[in-house]
């Protein structure tokens, strides 16, 4: 298998997930700056022009990080990272969606409204950036109150929620947002999970 990727949260969470599952993938870096995704060869593989996407041995293409994760879970059930029972699946999804929709999306809104890189891609608003950051902080408190695990966010093993949240915090630090420092359980988890081989290898 090959995964075409670029250093960004969605690709990072898939890499962490794959390492925790002990699934071997060849990673192919894509040059986004020079619009490699818009070349005929790449658009033939993925008309959406996005990364990451997974190319199987038979040429099948799987787009979108969540679809890739579902596929990887399906081809190697152990260790289970999406939930063993209906309740486990629901609890994992709660945290995973909070990390993605409550934190990652707010960070994206924030950076799109303050970064000079996006200045020519649409109107920017300091008020919108501040609102996004406030929502991020509010959702961090919800996350803090939701952590029930010690080494991991929930249960006694890594799940997709750990992968999503770690990649979210990596992105937050890259854009200078470190408000998570005030949340003790969250930061204790972040430090422990950051020492795992899946993180060291991904770096």
Question: Language-model segments: which ranges?
Answer:
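Short, flexible loop/turn segments with low-complexity composition
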Residues: 201-203
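GST-like domain detector, emphasizing the conserved glutathione-binding G-site
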Residues: 1-130, 151
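Aromatic-glycine hotspot motif
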Residues: 54, 66, 136-139, 198
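Intrinsic structural disorder
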Residues: 1, 193-196
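GST-like fold's C-terminal all-alpha helical module
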Residues: 99-194
């Amino acid at each position: 298998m090959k995964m075409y990727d670029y250093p960004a949260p969605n690709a990072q969470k898939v890499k962490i997930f794959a390492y925790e599952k002990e699934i071997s993938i060849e990673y192919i870096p894509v040059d986004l700056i020079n619009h490699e995704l818009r070349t005929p060869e790449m658009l033939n593989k993925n008309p959406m022009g996005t990364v990451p996407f997974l190319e199987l041995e038979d040429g099948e293409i799987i787009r979108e990080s969540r679809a890739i994760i579902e596929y990887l879970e399906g081809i190697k059930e152990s260790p289970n990272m999406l939930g063993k029972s209906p309740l486990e699946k629901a609890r994992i999804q709660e945290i995973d969606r909070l990390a993605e929709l409550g934190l990652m999306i707010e960070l994206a809104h924030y950076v799109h409204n303050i970064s000079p890189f996006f200045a020519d891609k649409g109107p920017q608003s300091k008020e919108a950036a501040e609102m996004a950051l406030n929502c991020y902080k509010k959702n961090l408190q919800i996350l803090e109150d939701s952590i029930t695990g010690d080494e991991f966010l929930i249960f006694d093993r890594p799940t997709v929620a750990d992968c999503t949240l770690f990649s979210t915090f990596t992105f937050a630090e890259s854009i200078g947002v470190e408000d998570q420092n005030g949340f003790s359980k969250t930061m204790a988890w972040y430090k422990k999970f950051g020492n795992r081989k899946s993180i060291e290898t991904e770096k």
